[in-house]
Swiss-Prot record:
GO BP terms in the entry: fatty acid biosynthetic process; lipid A biosynthetic process
Annotated family: Belongs to the thioester dehydratase family. FabZ subfamily.
Subcellular location per the Swiss-Prot or TrEMBL entry: Cytoplasm
Primary residence: cytoplasm
Active site: 57
One GO CC term on file: membrane
InterPro entries xref list: FabA_FabZ, FabZ, HotDog_dom_sf
Pfam families per UniProt: FabA
Protein name: 3-hydroxyacyl-[acyl-carrier-protein] dehydratase FabZ
Known catalytic reactions: a (3R)-hydroxyacyl-[ACP] = a (2E)-enoyl-[ACP] + H2O
Entry keyword set: Cytoplasm, Lipid A biosynthesis, Lipid biosynthesis, Lipid metabolism, Lyase
Enzyme class: lyase
């Protein structure tokens, strides 16, 4: 794999599983298609009718919950922060965890439904040490469905 000096720019699910601690049903990133360390990430999740959440949200009109869109954005931001510091390093990932600190300027614009490819477009707004602030949009077919600014910290995993 790549080093932190020359990080890879794409991650498939087998790579994501080695960096993020999330698992089904809370892993909300299927693939990273673009990653520029300390700058930006583009990732996505394919939304299918088989998502457990559609059993109750809503049975006759399935809509992917906005809070899960924001969580997917946060997971993408966590990947960006971690790989900006350590590149693709599964051993280091076992010792670190990214915690949400704040969520600001959230807007939901268009419902996300089964069959949509939900893209997360995030950029680093600022970071100092282990504190990272990212902002951006979630998009479907090039249309903004949500936007937010997120702050997180990278901590030691106990």
């Amino acid at each position: 794999m790549e080093t932190s000096q020359n990080p890879q720019s794409q991650f498939f699910i087998e790579h994501i599983l080695q960096i993020l601690p999330h698992r089904y049903p809370m892993l909300l990133v299927d693939r990273v298609v673009e990653l520029e360390a300390n700058k930006k990430i583009v990732a996505y999740k394919n939304i299918t009718f088989n998502e457990d959440v559609f059993n109750g949200h809503f049975p006759n009109k399935p809509i992917f919950p906005g809070v899960l869109i924001v969580e997917g954005m946060a997971q993408s931001g966590g990947l960006l922060a971690f790989t900006s510091l350590w590149g693709f390093d599964p051993e280091m990932a076992k010792t670190k965890i990214v915690y949400f600190m704040t969520i600001d300027k959230v807007k939901f614009r268009i419902p996300v439904t089964p069959g949509d490819k939900l893209e997360y477009h995030l950029e680093v707004l600022k970071h100092k040490g282990m504190i990272w602030q990212v902002g951006g949009t979630a998009q479907v077919d090039g249309k903004v469905v949500a936007e937010a600014e997120l702050k997180a910290m990278i901590a030691e995993r106990d």
